[in-house]
């Protein structure tokens, strides 16, 4: 089973990593190609392209300028520890053991606009480049054109080595589209997290994002390599609801939040 996550806009490079193990992203050559193109943009260009405030645009202008190879623990950080925000708050990777992270390295993949696909312990330098950005490049009009075939090949190669090829999609549609817009050779299971509000169950973005991280953590600490074990997921009061689920969409609900 492969578990897909989105990256995060918020980054944490202040907290020292609690593990020394690291790996290198598989597509640094392609990342460098994108960085070279991004360096041609002014802060105003970046603000317009990514709909950022002037301070955020300047921050990322400087990030692109400072991005450099090779990646080392001195100038980069493991992806799962660098990404912050709702999903990663739920995952709480800073509290995972080295053995947990080793298991996550086999099961979890983070889709990225700059790095393509990341393993949790792959080193990354700070950046902002969402997969949905309409950033024209030699491959086409956007990052889906740039990454699509590469991601599909990488994912299918991993799935081909599994006795039961299955993807648990905990990434957003923006990121999953980069891979699933084409054909993944395996089952795809999409968890849906709903909370009770105003007399009915509904998806509440903040809670749903955090639940994606919680489910990833549940899979990691319980060493789940098959999706069926996730039906027992009960973190933060969520429970699987079979009567509103089907083979592809697994619904988890909670009454109180």
Curated annotation (Swiss-Prot):
Pfam families: H2O2_YaaD (PF03883)
Organism classification: Bacteria, Pseudomonadati, Pseudomonadota, Betaproteobacteria, Rhodocyclales
Matches recorded under NCBIfam families: PRK02101.1-1 (NF002541), PRK02101.1-3 (NF002542)
GO CC list: cytosol
InterPro entries in UniProt: YaaA
Gene source species: Dechloromonas aromatica (strain RCB)
Protein name, UniProt field: UPF0246 protein Daro_2893
Record family assignment: Belongs to the UPF0246 family.
GO terms classed as biological process: response to hydroperoxide
